[in-house]
Amino acid sequence: MASLINVSSLVNRVKLDQSIIGSDEINKLYGSDAPLVFKDEVKMVIPGNAEGEAIKLQANILTADRLQSIRNAKVNGKEAAYLHLGFVPIAIRSLLPSGNEQIWGRCALVDTSRTRAETAVIDEFEFKFTKKQPFAAKLLTINAAVDINCKVSVGSIQVLLELHGVDLREERSVAAIITGLTCTPTNKMVLLHKIECDTPKWSLCNIIEQVEDEEESKKAFENMFNASSSNLIDLGQEQWLDEGKRTPLIGSLAIKGFGRKVMPVRRRNLTTRNLMKDYVSHVKSETASLKRSQSGRDWGNDRLRKYLEEQALEQARSSTDHQLVKAPKFKTIEVTGLETVHDLKDKIDKAESSTASDTGTK
């Protein structure tokens, strides 16, 4: 299977922070069906924490509006019955200038609609950065058709990440993860004829092929899955990559202006900084466990969720460290970037109290 793609070409795209699924290597695997393939990615910048706990993250790939666009696509003039799920790239890159050789982690591609880890895990692997290569990447294959009209069948395919070895005095951005999915509306059960029903995997860089303690690793992956959520919110700024590409006319020969166009890569860029993911989960992220009294759950779930969703939407539009967040029925609240749940609660309480005084209500 290694001969199917040029691995060094994909590794080079990882080094340049380019899209793996936007590569010609992926287009070649689809052959004549390449122009029908939808390509989606999500890029997340994730924070470390001052407590030194493991960083945990979960993310979905396809948004609800994107899925609807895919459903609307016709196949030879007919509505598609299936959505073929193809390739999933996962690339993790350090955003730290030093100490990268101490960073390692676990990653899993799972189906969160299942109840047991052994049936849910599509693939799992461990990785370790090096001083010369502070990044890791792997290309996975799902190669399965699901019901295109079933939201759960598509939305339950998610990535789980656990990062270790990050020590900080204060919270800061420590890493970026890019994952994606190629999918094709179809009325056929087999689409990738070069691999038939096989599911090859390509370790691109710094993937640990043999773990030291398999039982401990298995238990850790089970814990990751058991802690996952099936209810994530779609957010992020949209970006289009690898536009204007065409399929080769003869063999690998691509002539500018000729050949059928292939679709560009749709990427969502987002950050997990400053978001309480128990309530706002466009990604679900944890940097330390909170006691129940600290978690904000005693403080009106609906109210906290509503406010934090507004905060997340505003944060997705801005990359500054100092911003204004507006919530319905609340006065403008200043968020500086270091608030705890209690800080947010106090600010909202004061804003509500002030609003009530202005209107003569309680």
Curated annotation (Swiss-Prot):
The keyword Ribosomal protein does not apply. One of its GO terms (biological process) is symbiont-mediated suppression of host innate immune response. Coiled coil: none annotated. The keyword Transport applies. Disulfide bonds: none annotated. Keywords: Host-virus interaction, Inhibition of host innate immune response by virus, Suppressor of RNA silencing, Transport, Viral immunoevasion, Viral movement protein. It holds the Pfam family MP. Suppressor of viral-induced RNA silencing. This is Putative movement protein. It comes from Citrus leaf blotch virus (isolate Nagami kumquat/France/SRA-153/1984). The lineage of its organism: Viruses, Riboviria, Orthornavirae, Kitrinoviricota, Alsuviricetes.
